[in-house]
Amino acid sequence: MGVQKSEVETTSSVSAEKLFKGLCLDIDTLLPQVLPGAIKSSETLEGDGGVGTVKLVHLGDASPFKTMKQKVDAIDKATFTYSYSIIDGDILLGFIESINNHFTAVPNADGGCTVKSTIIFNTKGDAVVPEENIKFANDQNLTIFKAVEAYLIAN
């Protein structure tokens, strides 16, 4: 299995607690409001929203993909850390075993936060994820971040 990793860091004027809640805990209800074309629906297949929960996400018309199955790997409300894995769906392109996503919001002295996002692509065999796919994943995460951030600032 091959492993490729991408890390992105950005800052926000929104507090770490509020951003963590919006981007991680409330994302299933918030995302359809702020980016209507991103997802059509999300259904819980197993669990209660905590660690181990498995969700089937039906992506919206703005996405080139149709579905993805996500599993919540870790939630730490004290450190504003959330991790989940994409374990199934056409988003895996047939040569990716899974995609691990890690999000941390670190409080800043000014009341805002620094957001650290890590994506780990676990490929089948010796497959390599093309750079344009990695860039697409980072761009999608940034688009979601900016939309949620704008909503939280306005509300």
From Swiss-Prot:
GO terms of molecular function: abscisic acid binding; protein phosphatase inhibitor activity; signaling receptor activity
InterPro entries tied to this protein: Bet_v_I/MLP (IPR000916), Bet_v_I_allergen (IPR024949), Plant_def-hormone_signal (IPR050279), START-like_dom_sf (IPR023393)
Any one annotated GO CC term: cytoplasm
Biological processes, Gene Ontology terms: abscisic acid-activated signaling pathway; defense response
Record protein name field: Pathogenesis-related protein A
Underlying gene: PCPR1-1
Record lineage: Eukaryota, Viridiplantae, Streptophyta, Embryophyta, Tracheophyta
PANTHER family recorded: OS08G0374000 PROTEIN-RELATED, STRESS-INDUCED PROTEIN SAM22
Keyword terms of this UniProt record: Pathogenesis-related protein, Plant defense
Similarity comment text for this entry: Belongs to the BetVI family.
Pfam families: Bet_v_1
